[in-house]
Amino acid sequence: MEILSLLSYSVFYLALFFIFNIVIRARKFKNLPPGPPSLPIIGNLHHLKRPLHRTFKGLSEKYGHVFSLWFGSRLVVVVSSASEFQQCFTKNDVVLANRPRFLSGKYIFYNYTTLGSTSYGEHWRNLRRITALDVLSNHRINSFSGIRRDETQRLITRLADDSSTNFAEMELSSRLYDMTFNNIMRMISGKRYYGEDCDTSDLQEASQFRDMVSELLQLSGANNKTDFMPLLRFLDFENLEKRLKDISGKTDAFLRGLIEEHRTKKERANTMIDHLLNLQDSQPEYYTDQIIKGLALAMLLAGTDSSAVTLEWSMSNLLNHPEVLKKVKDELDTHVGQDRLVDESDLPKLTYLKNVINETLRLYTPAPLLLPHSTSDECNIGGYKVPQDTIVLINAWAIHRDPELWTEATTFKPERFEKKGELEKLIAFGMGRRACPGEGLAIRAISMTLALLIQCFDWKLINGDKIDLAERDGFTLTKLVPLKAMCKSRPVINKVFKQ
């Protein structure tokens, strides 16, 4: 009997606590965007079915283009329309310039001090200046054109060796990832760690690097419930915090080793690390080792995965739409021909190729929810009150498929970008102060690779079967089934590579 009484009192007080919590929350947060009812402690975490961008699109159809959720104890507002997106990054741009603090940012991103993880302020402005002037300026991007040319030609050579004059089945996914990682790492440090022809001077270092990057990509986008329910941090059932600490130590040791290796060289080369070390000699307070490590890490994580998946989605859609593939090939044959390889100087003339890439970015936005923002003050979005310290997510995937914004919104149709004003609606790289600074580099690298793949080879489906466009769950929108296709060398291969 006493046990039953105790249980009854416990249930009563627990219910009273939950009701009290709901009343306090309702009084504190008035005129919030609408959203589904939340549960005590977990909030709306039970609503978060994967993939999130599709779940959020479904919720926006029920609750409106601006809706709110509770991720445990943290308020989240999701924006799914172009007009509210514009409001966020024009009127509210400064208020939304902060980043939420997640556990991965503490360990992987040097205690929230890297360009993508730090909040708005003097440190961010310094990082943005360094990135714009010393890392991703047009001059610096142009200086790495030889690396991009060499890496894409290595890819073409390997494909040509395997295909020759007859159609042969090719697995493209891993080749595109290898090329993209080598491209970025050569820009950062002059080293190649991927593929059969990677630098053989230290195979163990290359293997350790590949393992490290694989874990970094997994953990940096990990769904960590302790970010939203702090009590779980003490339990850490998934051992996530320990894994974050371990990979943080490995990454820091690797980057420190790279910097020391370049610092002790007699002559500086054309790499990002060497260039920043030269600046460190004259301005050590601005170009510290930690800033150099953070910039290298940001380049590695932001500049690889997204470019590789965009190439894979582009080729997948071209194979599924042979009439579009033919138009790109005809454009290349008209402006470049088969007597020489396409060069970066040709890209401005290849307008249809550019439309294909833009259409791929629209339908298959590499980061469907972009990077999360955090409000530094109370603001208004879509007529609703958004309190300070709210996480704001932009469902770019939903905006890019909004039938009110795009005709035939779910159809792969590159011609849409021939119409004036369409390009301005594309938000794959964000907008405002926190827009991705690497857009220019990414578009140039993607354009060159895609152009060479189409100029140098004929492509077709395996047995006529359409490419499976199913998505894999994750922060980056990757294909569930790795891309395979049939390819055959075109005349330019013999004229350029086999003379």
From Swiss-Prot:
One Pfam short name: p450
Keyword Metal-binding tagged: yes
Binding site for heme: C436
EC number: 1.14.14.90
CDD domains for the chain: CYP81
Induction: By fungal elicitor.
Record's keyword annotation contains Ribonucleoprotein: no
InterPro entries associated with the record: Cyt_P450, Cyt_P450_CS, Cyt_P450_E_grp-I, Cyt_P450_sf, Plant_Cytochrome_P450_Monoox
Cofactor: heme
UniProt cross-references to SUPFAM superfamilies, sorted A to Z: Cytochrome P450 (SSF48264)
Span of the signal peptide: none
Domain of life: Eukaryota
GO terms for MF: heme binding; iron ion binding; isoflavone 2'-hydroxylase activity
Keywords tagged on the record: Heme, Iron, Membrane, Metal-binding, Monooxygenase, Oxidoreductase
GO cellular component terms attached to this protein's record: membrane
Protein location: Membrane
Reaction(s) the record says it catalyses: a 2'-unsubstituted isoflavone + reduced [NADPH--hemoprotein reductase] + O2 = a 2'-hydroxyisoflavone + oxidized [NADPH--hemoprotein reductase] + H2O + H(+)
Function: Catalyzes the hydroxylation of isoflavones, daidzein and formononetin, to yield 2'-hydroxyisoflavones, 2'-hydroxydaidzein, and 2'-hydroxyformononetin, respectively.
Annotated family: Belongs to the cytochrome P450 family.
Additional observations: Involved in the biosynthesis of isoflavonoid-derived antimicrobial compounds of legumes.
PANTHER family for the chain: CYTOCHROME P450 82C3-RELATED (PTHR47947), ISOFLAVONE 2'-HYDROXYLASE-LIKE (PTHR47947:SF24)
Record-given protein name: Isoflavone 2'-hydroxylase
Organism of origin: Glycyrrhiza echinata (Licorice)
Record lineage: Eukaryota, Viridiplantae, Streptophyta, Embryophyta, Tracheophyta
